[in-house]
Amino acid sequence: MVNIVEKQNRLSLISLSLVSIRYKSWDFLYRILHGSIFDYIIGPRKELLLYFKCVYDSTFFNGKNYFSNLFTDTATSFRLLTFLNEHDLKSIPPLPLDKCQGLDSYSTLYDGYIVQSSHESQGLYDGSGKDGNDYTMKMQIMKNVLEMQINEMDDEIKRIKLRRNVVAKKLDVIISRIVDHKENKSKTDGSTEDEVHIGNTSSVLKQTNHEHTIITSENNTDDKVSLLTLEPDNAQIGNKLQRYFEAMKLKKKSSGFDIEDFENIIGTKGQLGKTLKCHDDYINSLAINAQLGVLSSTANLDNEIKLWDISTTQCLGVLSGHRATVNTTRFIDDTRLLASAGKDASVKVWDVDNIVDKDGNANDNLCLATFDGHKDSVTALATTGNAIVSGSNDKTLRHWDLGSGKCIQSIDLTIALKMVPQSVSKLDITPSFNTPLIGGADCIDNALVTGTKDGIVYLWDLRIGRVVGSLEGHRGPITSLKYMGSELITGSMDKSTRIWDLRMGSVAELLSFEKEVVSVEESQTQLINALEGEPVKIYDRGERQYNSLPDSFNTTTLVVYESLLALGNDHGDITWWSL
């Protein structure tokens, strides 16, 4: 009888427990297993109830339910303890009840391993644990976690790009405000169309807290714009240069510049004249002041500028002061002043008129001023009125006023060119060893033209320091540029010379060659093209014909005045021609 009762009690408890588990009547089952009746049960019934008590505890307190309380939900607790998001929680495969309990759940480590806290099922990541399903589960969790991390990285990249776009828009607004401020300041100060007066913008720049400036103030004393350094006394900078500038205004000689006076060196038309041995390396710059009858020349690896008397072909003197190769020279309009720029990142102004003193001796103290503002090699110069514009590999253009001896504008190309509304975003403004960033520059009044290594021509308004137009067509670096009012001539390493109609913004004529164009000049209706390793080609625009100058191979630069042509070659020689 007792055995029958025990069996009935056992079956009743089993049925009751199963029903409770099936319908999740945890409170009712808890009272049975943890109540006083449990203490009176002995024998096999006790063992059975212990089993169900274990099942109950593992079910009620496993995983998500273990950390449930009045302050949080199970999903949040489980996510925090396992470092998984809601999506990954839903994708976790089912586990045995003796797995995934409380702090025994899995978590990722930075070294790529998965560690389980339970001592009963501790295994290695290589699948050598006791349970094959355990290993599969580990791999699945690891896969989900890594995918989650990748998604988070992608989201972070999107947020960074979005923030960058916002900052770029703010930058454009700040630049526009700076330009508007300068325009309003100029109008308030009563500046005319032909003058450039840049007010103090340092307060505006400080308010914006921005590191880059497109136009810097002439009163700015930090390293971004280094003011002109005069030799030998900086304190006399403005007065000395102003005095020389006013005194150097040229009045034409009564005799003028007559080509016939130089027939002895030029020879007959189209024939080679006299050849001068001037330098030891290839000549990189020539400049003529016809009213003085002086030619200047510079060469590679030569820190000096040599001045030549055109009528006698004698060397008048040497200008020393640069600390590295002189890249380019230019006579300042209507003055006896010569501007030079070199790889030492400096721009110098020289008094050429006093190359010889009253006693006929060479004068060594001819450098009037040194502009030390650039941080890299200066490769292009343009002069207009009483100003000089210099272009450098440091990605800036600087506008120097000879009247005051100060830098009145500093234009950062990395910022200014981003404001051009066209396909210039592809522009690579990184200078290379052999190709300068700015290959040519020319200026008329406040209109500046520059040519870059990517073959793009930019038109600038110096009054506001901004690009007002661009010309695209060249497929190689621009090496030479000549601005002639309504027309512009450019030579390029893409083996072409282009004549641009600036009124239409298009190419008027295109000249193609078999070699790279290294220098271009214009004389009346003729275009003189110096080509890499070939004779000089002369194009007659009226007759549309090409002619070659004999014995003009390896020309590296050239300069022309009326029918006088001077060629510099890679041997350091200068040859004269009559066109």
Curated annotation (Swiss-Prot):
InterPro entries: G-protein_beta_WD-40_rep (IPR020472), WD40/YVTN_repeat-like_dom_sf (IPR015943), WD40_repeat_CS (IPR019775), WD40_repeat_dom_sf (IPR036322), WD40_rpt (IPR001680). Residues 137-167 form a coiled coil. Keywords: Coiled coil, Membrane, Mitochondrion, Mitochondrion outer membrane, Repeat, WD repeat. The keyword Repeat applies. The keyword Transmembrane helix does not apply. One of its GO terms (cellular component) is nucleus. It is a peripheral membrane protein. It is found in: Mitochondrion outer membrane. WD repeats lie at residues 278-320, 321-360, 373-412, 419-472, 473-510, 512-539, 540-578. Pfam families: WD40. Its main location: mitochondrion. Involved in mitochondrial fission. Has a partially redundant function to MDV1 in acting as an adapter protein required to form mitochondrial fission complexes. Formation of these complexes is required to promote constriction and fission of the mitochondrial compartment at a late step in mitochondrial division. Belongs to the WD repeat MDV1/CAF4 family. This is CCR4-associated factor 4 homolog. It comes from Candida glabrata (strain ATCC 2001 / BCRC 20586 / JCM 3761 / NBRC 0622 / NRRL Y-65 / CBS 138) (Yeast). The lineage of its organism: Eukaryota, Fungi, Dikarya, Ascomycota, Saccharomycotina. The gene is CAF4.
